[in-house]
């Protein structure tokens, strides 16, 4: 009898522990991501670069622009903001930022991404709760058109290099891509800001990459880590594929922040600081109970 009572007591205790563990295992507390997406179409091409070659139209290799519809060699923060709500190819009408990268060619034919591209805003540091929004007007260049293959391969921003089909970690374009596939590239930006300069002489040194998941003392301010994930609709023989800047390892991109500050702050707070895997509305489909940062019109609640 005593044995049966002891077994019953143990069973009750185990059941209680399991119940408490299950109740405490709220999926909302299981942090595996801290990011949101920006989805934008390529909207124009120009031989301009308002960060590296400001006010010099035609002086650059050709870039494909996404985001703000008005970006050109004369672009400033004021001109991006003056474009007005909705003057963007991105889903969020209040993201008036400009994003651009070298145009890809197959021979002499431009290879233009023909659907919305993905730009991730992530935490680049371990303490994702500390990430803060970009200041208005912050701008920088990621990568370099003058990189060597080894520099591109060893760059702290590389993810998987160029990829297509089952071929990954290519630091120049692969020789062939399976028919019907796309040529993809993913590249991460530095996410630590020096807290003073919106730009620098080389358009890079005011930013830094984290070291072991922590911002260095020279650049102590954590901001979102951009990760461009661009898909080019080209496959087959890649021998004639090139970038306007040169070989595949010359890949680089530019960012000029012109977000509406309250909108960016809401997305950073809800998705990055909140430990969510958000879509462009700031909604995590795996944790729907957490809600969305933006309305169905991709604007802050209450904005038409």
Kindly give the residue locations of the regions a language model identified.
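Secretory targeting and sorting signals
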Residues: 1-26
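Primary mode marks residue(s) on the alpha4-beta5-alpha5 output face of response regulator receiver
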Residues: 26-60, 64-187, 194-304
């Amino acid at each position: 009898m005593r044995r049966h009572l002891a077994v019953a007591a143990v069973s009750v205790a185990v059941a209680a522990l399991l119940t408490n563990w299950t109740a405490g295992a709220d999926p909302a507390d299981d942090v595996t991501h801290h990011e949101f997406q920006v989805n934008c179409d390529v909207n124009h091409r120009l031989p301009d670069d308002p960060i590296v070659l400001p006010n010099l139209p035609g002086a650059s290799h050709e870039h494909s622009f996404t985001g703000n519809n008005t970006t050109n060699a004369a672009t400033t923060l004021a001109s991006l903001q003056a474009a007005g709500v909705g003057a963007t190819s991105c889903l969020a009408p209040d993201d008036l930022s400009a994003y651009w990268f070298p145009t890809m060619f197959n021979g002499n034919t431009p290879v233009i991404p023909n659907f919305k591209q993905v730009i991730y805003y992530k935490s680049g540091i371990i303490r994702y709760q500390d990430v803060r929004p970009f200041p208005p007007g912050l701008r920088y260049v990621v990568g370099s058109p003058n990189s060597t293959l080894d520099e591109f391969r060893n760059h702290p921003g590389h993810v998987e290099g160029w990829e297509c089909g089952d071929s990954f970690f290519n630091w120049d374009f692969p020789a062939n891509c399976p028919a019907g596939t796309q040529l993809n590239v993913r590249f991460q930006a530095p996410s630590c800001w020096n807290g003073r300069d919106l730009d620098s002489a080389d358009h890079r040194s005011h930013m830094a990459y984290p070291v072991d998941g922590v911002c260095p003392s020279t650049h102590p301010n954590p901001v979102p880590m951009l990760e461009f994930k661009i898909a080019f609709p080209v496959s087959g023989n890649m021998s004639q594929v090139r970038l306007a800047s040169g070989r595949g390892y010359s890949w680089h991109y530019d960012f000029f922040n012109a977000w509406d500050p309250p909108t960016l702050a809401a997305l950073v707070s809800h998705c990055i600081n909140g430990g969510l895997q958000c879509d462009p509305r700031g909604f995590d489909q795996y944790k729907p109970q957490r809600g969305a940062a933006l309305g169905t019109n991709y604007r802050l609640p209450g904005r038409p």
